[in-house]
């Protein structure tokens, strides 16, 4: 009578894996019974090699099998003709596929007395056939997704041993029909299927990993067969416990069977916390989402695996809390548990039960030692109180939390900053209190998530209890303000410090106007923090400066606090304290000395560049905010920084440094650049940026000279520059190798000799070197350099006070052009002058915008007329346009003057160079403001300059679009100028549109000639005749129109010469007749000459025909 099959033990499976026959021989017969099929088959098969070791192994297997009665029946299964059986089974499978009723006719498989009794009485071959047919029937039901029918052989445990024996041998003998993975999919649906599969895997241990991965990949816990597959996986894991972690890894990789994964983890409880932490806080977002979804769904159906995990975690929390005094790494273990429970709650949505809440409350309110790890534990515990509101859901729990927080405040070791650390718990408590007072739950959520290093949702309504604790019981608003200002500034504050700092607290308090409300001064603290900042700049520092400036100027939106009683801007002495180490501050002139207080002298500037950039950002933002809120000030006097003071600070140099260290000043460079472009456009001109880039490319390496350049040496070289230029060349090259900070020290000496350097007798190479030095100085502190350059050019330092682009002197661009005539005749001086002129016009435009805004607001305050906007806008536009057009006209008149004085070859070369310089300036002016071109040409300029303008200004082609409008003007001079301009334009731009404009000009000429008197007609024709020739030269098709104009004009002049100037003036005397005849001859000669010129122009274009 068959007996029930024993499950495969782990040691038997291990011995089968290693084929350790000695161990198998030492195990009881019942224990090795499931693996006998493989052992019997190995003993009967002929070995592949006949080595001595192979023979010994075979003897050992036979020794194990001797005396086991069931071996004989297994041997009989091996004697079946499997080749013939395979053919029969194939036919059966084909018949199953063809007939839908096959399974109904094969229930008994040819057995007369039923399957169970017939199976016992059948011969060996029939038994094998019955078992395999039963398997095929089961596979067919599974493939058709039908519920598995009852099977006497597979459901009853008394036949399992024989079924396993047959299947093990059939798997080896019939590989084309049977596959262990397919068998697994079929057998998993029967009650004893997991035991059969485990026995099969034990006989084929090399298939273990394939079977496990196959079952995991196809397992759905919510499916109908999920429970059976879980039983199979647990059976396989118990059979081979050494692979438990490997199986768990497969679950994680495939994102399958989380219950099995957790049960495997519980077999290694020491690894539980680390494993769960990795799932929820790892870098794999898909894994985190998958496990979080499992936690939520498992809570609904009360999954046993999750409950077991919660029980184990709860025991660990209780054990850790109970043994806190004895554990050396309590802080570390507690911090890990806190983060894990926060992740389970925030990411997985786990709802704590009462036991977990009490245990976690006990853990959170622990009082560790004041060590760095203790501070870390307490910080995480504080964040967990906020992230898990259930920890303060009852009055006892709330009281316990309040006592713990009060203990934190009393403990200076926790509340105050510890040596060697960048933050303190007190700063974090302050910042939380600030956020709670201002009801900024999103900022609290961001802070908690950042501290816990996880993204968890914190809803506003869930924080009401903890908010009440902070704002009413612990930190009132006044306590927060008074304590925050006494917190020391963060030394060496930089962007790599990611924790929450005092600067965060101050920034939030300033933003909420708490300091103003409770009359707490804060300027000194902010100044110290600016001086203690280093690069890379902390991202909150620009925000701190911005909110400080807003507090100084912008009124409180609620209107409850008068802002004029407390905060004060930085004084000039404080600002100069930051710039005291700079070699570039006021290198042209010194301001009156300012006394520094003893407290100010004790403040050390850690990183001068960072502090100076922050202070410049403050100044730019302060001025911009003040000007934008003039109406909001309501007549209240607000501090203004003098223009001379602002002009002496190296704004442009610092902006370049911020651009050079762009990554270190990422949060500061862009807003600073925006402010400078808006308020100081002369410091951010395109030409300067391109010039500085080219200089940086050409001199990428700065060589520090071993020998310092003495001022006496520089003066001596500059004084003898005309007689001994080699001295100047050597000195200038040495200067070019110096960094800009060092060059600036010699700026006053260099600029003082500016006219002497650019004298005609000085070699051009020396001028080029000096020009490079001037451009380098211009890149450092341009406003001061421009002032000194203008003084040197005008040779009247007494008549020109110190001027910057924020006051009236240099705001008038015409004063820049009021220079001696030799300046315009020197190409180098002219380039310097035009660079200053561009900056002057840019600054003047900004000043007029601000001035218009101020005046406009004042007018609106008086009468509120809507027309005021347009009136002031028109005035501003008109004034700016008049300044720009006046500058262009002056330059064009200079060009006309120089052209009139050009007599020799050298002067013509200088004229050509100056023409290119002025043409480039005019071109840029026309491109930036196209309407300026229309205004300049409407006002006209010397006709002799027109050819040079067309040749040297590429943007002159835009005049073709509007030049026809000027021909409608009745003034003859403007018509002549327009026709002459048009002729040069069409000669240079022979495009279809030019042909239409040319025809229009000829029509105007013809119409005008028909309406003029004889003398006026001749004068007009004499002026437009060269233009007509250029029209014909460009478009020969216009020759007929020009000839027609000449012939008509000639007939009219001839007729009038015979009658007099008019029909009423008959020539009565001989002298009058002679005079009239002489004039007529001259007119006829002029027309003949014009006709010859036309013919010549047409002949030049003969190649077109």
From Swiss-Prot:
GO BP terms: namely: positive regulation of gene expression; positive regulation of neuron differentiation; RNA polymerase II transcription initiation surveillance; snRNA 3'-end processing; snRNA processing
Q: Which family does it belong to?
A: Belongs to the Integrator subunit 2 family.
Bilayer disposition of the protein: Single-pass membrane protein
The record, for PANTHER family, names:
INTEGRATOR COMPLEX SUBUNIT 2 (PTHR28608:SF1)
Q: What does this protein do?
A: Component of the integrator complex, a multiprotein complex that terminates RNA polymerase II (Pol II) transcription in the promoter-proximal region of genes. The integrator complex provides a quality checkpoint during transcription elongation by driving premature transcription termination of transcripts that are unfavorably configured for transcriptional elongation: the complex terminates transcription by (1) catalyzing dephosphorylation of the C-terminal domain (CTD) of Pol II subunit Polr2A/Rbp1 and Spt5, and (2) degrading the exiting nascent RNA transcript via endonuclease activity.
Give the encoding gene's name.
Answer: IntS2
Species in which this protein is naturally found: Drosophila melanogaster
Q: List where the protein spans the membrane.
A: 822-842
> Which keywords belong to this entry?
Membrane, Nucleus, Transmembrane, Transmembrane helix
UniProt protein name: Integrator complex subunit 2
Subunit details: Belongs to the multiprotein complex Integrator, at least composed of IntS1, IntS2, IntS3, IntS4, omd/IntS5, IntS6, defl/IntS7, IntS8, IntS9, IntS10, IntS11, IntS12, asun/IntS13, IntS14 and IntS15. The core complex associates with protein phosphatase 2A subunits mts/PP2A and Pp2A-29B, to form the Integrator-PP2A (INTAC) complex.
